[in-house]
């Protein structure tokens, strides 16, 4: 489904389409909220109030792509709450811990067939919609703002969503005037560091430092030495076309692949997976070969799914001390159904959908260059 599919020709949200395609939406009115922050009652009531606030900002008969993203972000910002809401005996009220991450996964599933650039802006806004509540009270507000300035959606979009979220809440903890002042101060801070509406300029060590810890020696090399070689990190679901991209663009580069290593050590079958012990051995061999390539300053490509930020961080931890140029290549099939069809005899539909659910789009702090390729 595309984001435009949830809007009528007159620029209004088509709630019949939403309810028929997003089952979680039908659970919002049955999901309670903490009374101190949400006197409006259930999540559905709050969501409708936030949508009304956003409609005041961007609504109209003719909606731009920007308008549709912002209205969709307002509509789905709390879509993860039904699965995350629990009663806390300690707090004596309901909590919805990590609902922003659950919401991101739901939105990506629903709009997977949307253009990646549009879809990932929406996913980013849902995942980060809580961030502005905590910036000023954090240990390093400037660092947080610099990081957010480089996100998939800019700080203006994020603060607009957060302000609508605040205005759409009946809160005993923050008045509308206090919300407005908080957002104004964050905007001023973003402007002062050059990150209001555009990404902050960063050194390589600062950028990668948002993803992983770096030694002083690694920071020195990242900022003052020419990389001289490249590590490509492939990212994509099974069947997305990673092998095809490699053959067409970097066929001469040394390829490191878990599938190939599994074959080497005798794990047999169609798209086989070994025991835990065997898979640990596959990881050891791959990492050993990756480090060897880095020591020799040899271009290489890590050709696995690498859909989680955790796995990509493990790779970065190994390679950054050697100062390579890091290129992430994200390859996507036109639709999720295409992924399933291309690998139907090798990877089950259930596995692909599970991997899609755990997919995390690469962030700016994970690469020097991001290449996005959608297979036809």
Where are these regions (language model features)?
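Glycine-rich phosphate-binding P-loop
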Residues: 230-250
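Conserved substrate/cofactor phosphate-moiety recognition/catalytic segment
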Residues: 243-298, 335-338
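ATP-dependent NMP and nucleoside kinases share a basic, alpha-helical "lid"
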Residues: 264-268, 306-347, 358
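N-terminal pre-Walker A segment at the start of P-loop NTPase domains
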Residues: 189-226
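Divalent metal-dependent catalytic cores for phosphoryl transfer on phosphate-bearing substrates
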Residues: 60-177
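Conserved GTP-binding G-domain of TRAFAC-class P-loop NTPases and closely related GTPase folds
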Residues: 252, 332-376
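Glycine-rich phosphate-binding loop used to anchor ATP phosphates in small-molecule kinases
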Residues: 277-324, 330
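Acidic/His-rich, divalent-metal-binding segments that scaffold phosphate/diphosphate chemistry
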Residues: 1-87
């Amino acid at each position: 489904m595309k984001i435009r599919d949830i809007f009528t020709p007159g620029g209004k949200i088509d709630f019949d389409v939403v309810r028929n395609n997003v089952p979680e939406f039908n659970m919002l009115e049955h999901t309670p909220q903490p009374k101190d922050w949400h006197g409006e009652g259930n999540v559905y009531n709050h969501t409708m109030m936030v949508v009304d606030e956003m409609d005041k900002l961007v609504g109209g008969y003719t909606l731009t792509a920007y308008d549709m993203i912002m209205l969709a972000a307002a509509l789905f910002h709390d879509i993860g709450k039904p699965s995350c809401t629990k009663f806390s005996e300690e707090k004596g009220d309901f909590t919805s811990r990590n609902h922003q991450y659950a919401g991101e996964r739901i939105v990506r599933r629903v709009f997977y067939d949307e253009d990646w650039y549009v879809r990932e802006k929406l996913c980013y806004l849902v995942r980060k919609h809580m961030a502005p509540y905590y910036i000023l009270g954090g240990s390093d507000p400037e660092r947080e703002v610099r990081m957010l300035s480089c996100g998939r959606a800019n700080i203006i979009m994020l603060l607009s969503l957060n302000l609508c979220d605040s205005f759409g809440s009946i809160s005993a903890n923050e008045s509308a005037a206090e919300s407005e002042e908080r957002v104004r101060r964050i905007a001023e801070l973003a402007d002062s560091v050059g990150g209001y509406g555009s990404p902050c300029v960063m050194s390589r060590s600062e950028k990668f430092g948002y993803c992983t810890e770096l030694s002083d020696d690694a920071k020195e090399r990242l900022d003052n030495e020419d990389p001289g070689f490249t590590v490509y990190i492939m990212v994509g679901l099974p069947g997305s076309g990673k092998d095809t991209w490699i053959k067409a663009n970097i066929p001469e580069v040394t390829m490191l692949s878990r599938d190939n290593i599994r074959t080497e050590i005798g794990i047999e079958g169609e798209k086989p997976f070994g025991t835990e012990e065997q898979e640990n051995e596959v990881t050891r061999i791959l990492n050993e070969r990756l480090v060897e390539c880095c020591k020799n300053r040899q271009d290489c490509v890590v050709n696995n799914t690498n859909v989680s930020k955790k796995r990509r961080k493990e790779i970065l931890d190994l390679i950054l001390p050697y100062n390579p140029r890091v290129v992430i290549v994200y390859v996507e099939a036109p639709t999720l159904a295409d992924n399933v069809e291309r690998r139907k005899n090798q990877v089950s539909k259930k596995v692909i959908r599970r991997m899609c659910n755990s997919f995390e789009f690469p962030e700016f702090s994970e690469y020097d260059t991001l290449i996005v390729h959608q297979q036809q």
